[in-house]
Amino acid sequence: IPITSMQLHLKAEDSKLSWRLTSDLLHIGQYVEMVLTYLRLGADTTDYVFRTVHLDKILGENIRKLRGDFIMKKLDLVYVPSDETVVSDEKWLSFVIEQILSNALKYTNEGSVTISIEKPKTLCISDTGIGISPEDIPRIFEKGYTGGNGHESKQASGLGLYLCRQICNRLGHEISVISEVGRGTTMRIHMDQYQCIKF
């Protein structure tokens, strides 16, 4: 894949420009992946493979993938590795986690992103970003909805959180949000239950 080849080439260099280009390529790849995921979810042949998944493994992979954004925006990452495991589909769960982390980075200009594991089997991702207005919160999981922040930043596709909710529904997990304008957002994925649900 050309995008992957370019990313590997750029990672061999350590400069501000290479990190910026790597970040831009990652975002292009994310948009492509969102479209493909949207199409897969609409297919009757979507397969889910449930097994014991180590959250630290998935988190580590996504943190490494997004490290260029952390570096470019000079944001702190607060995360203590955990040995927590859940029963889920690793590929689909990884997509959800990447989307949430990517959103946290996108809408946080200073401060930090904090990743923690709460009981029972709940992944919590918090940021010190611009937050979501109370009137937008009930609609952020709707397809195509970008809200005020999305319109202002012109970075939102209106698909990311919609896909996260759809995937979590299919996995039998639950996704929730708490946010305050000017203080940040906390997203939680509750994975104490799982179930392959066909639509």
Task: Give the role of each language-model region.
Residues 145-155:
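Glycine-rich ATP-lid/hinge loop adjacent to the conserved G-boxes
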Residues 104-105:
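Short helix-loop "hinge" at the ATP-lid/N-box region of the Bergerat-fold HATPase_c
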Residues 49-67:
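A conserved beta-strand-to-alpha-helix junction within the catalytic ATP-binding
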Residues 132-145:
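Short conserved segment of the HATPase_c
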Residues 43-48, 81, 85-91:
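Conserved micro-motifs of the catalytic ATP-binding
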Residues 112-122:
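Short beta-strand/loop element within the Bergerat-fold HATPase_c
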